[in-house]
Amino acid sequence: MGLPNISIIFKTTASAAIARSDKGTVGLILRDTNTELQDKVYTIRSVADIPDFTDANNVHFVKRALLGYINPPRKIIAYVLSTDAANLEDGMTYFETQGDIDYLCGPYNCTAAETSAIVTWIKSRRQAHSIIKAVLPNSNADSESVINVTVSGTKDSDGVITTAALCSRIAGLIAGTPMTISCTYAPLPELTKITRLSEEAANTAIDAGEFILIHDGEKIKVGRGVNSLVTTTPDKGAAFKKIKIVEALDMIGRDIRLTCEDNYIGKYANSYDNKCVLIAAIKGYLESLELSGILQKGSSTCEIDTVSQESYLKSTGVDTSELSEQEIKEANTCDQVFLACSVKILDAIEDIAITVTI
């Protein structure tokens, strides 16, 4: 049985991805003494949508997120806890099932213990294919899923902004950065002061996975759009330190996986022929992203991941020692699909492989 609809579905997915790449969604976990707001979720798209917080710091925190960069964030999803809440567990539990959140911040006064708890949670969510990333104060998490904000001495016209309170501004700025550009050198015109770093100190901080702001003598701006990843591996090279690269990879990986889960697995016979039709549809999706300027033209490939497929066959007791590569590709994998997609994100230094196992 063929796949008459899968190409159309991926074309629709590509169109949605291109639109979504212009701006992302910010999640905020807040605390407030207003009992009418507690344990509730609020969708905020403009200042007019901000709830009646008792704590003015929450209002400022949300307003900073709304500033964005080229665009404002698509929306802000705020989960409000009681000020008596012992931890952020309820907020994290809520966001665990919200697949459209791109960047998450803890409260404006997020403690070191709360920051650590979010890091642990974010890393576990990433293992479960979540694309949510955290923007946190002073957190050397060594992970592409955590942006480590270390800016100090920050002020705007309203007064001092702590590092934790600045995180919503950074999350909104990143979410408002189209995927075709980077947030590097993005200006923050509302800021009047930061602790200034020498060029050497700034370079050292960036190399250590810190998201910093610099003063160029005229304005305050982002030093470089990097996350907290420091330790690289053959599978996760230096390109994964860039927020822009990780954002694009997360979007592509999620789109392919969810589209396959929702429209392929269980809907069609998992035959070799159907896999080939699926692969052709995915290639069309990637080519659409090439045309939109997210991927380098002519760089995208998608094929059956023979290494993973052979490993799966061995785990089911199949002797693959005498099988050719083509026979491994055509082998029955029950309800499993193993695909290897290779893309080149514009501005990336190296080719990056995405393994999609469904």
Language-model-derived ranges and their functions:
Residues G2, G27-D32, Y42, T93-D262, ...:
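A glycine- and small-residue-enriched flexible loop/hinge signal that marks low-structured segments
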Residues V26-V119, S130:
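An N-terminal, globular interaction/scaffold subdomain
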